[in-house]
Amino acid sequence: MDKDLFKTIDTIIRKERLYAQVNLMREDIMQRFGIGRHHLNDQLNTFADGMSFPQYINSIRMEVAYELLTNHLEMTITEIAREVGFTAPNLREQFKRCYGITPAEYRAGLISADDEE
């Protein structure tokens, strides 16, 4: 397996913010890198902890959403959702599944922690 290929795919998805495309498809990545479905799946299985393509993209979206919620308090949750390729309800659902709390609950905890300092 070629870890350099996976690193390149991951870097491009992040730097070009491809994850923010609501309808990003596996085929878009396959075409961009000239690889087949099986090869992409092998890359994900080997270097992305066996995630499916949608799981992998959602994991990146969650990382970015977490960072934006933490470091950009001026952004609304709806703005953050759009920024990462979700609707606000999708972000709420995925964030709660991933972190055990909603984005609003997470942000409220940040704000109250700042008030206590």
Map each language-model feature to its residues.
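Basic/polar phosphate-binding segments, predominantly the helix-turn-helix DNA-binding elements
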Residues: 27-55, 81-102
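Terminal helix-turn-helix DNA-binding modules in bacterial transcription factors
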Residues: 47-83, 109-117
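Basic, amphipathic alpha-helical hairpins
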Residues: 10-24, 43-48, 66-75, 95
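General nucleic-acid-binding
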Residues: 1-34, 38
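…primarily DNA-binding HTH/wHTH and HhH modules…
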Residues: 94-117
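Weak global preference for isoleucine
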Residues: 9-13, 29, 35, 57-60, ...
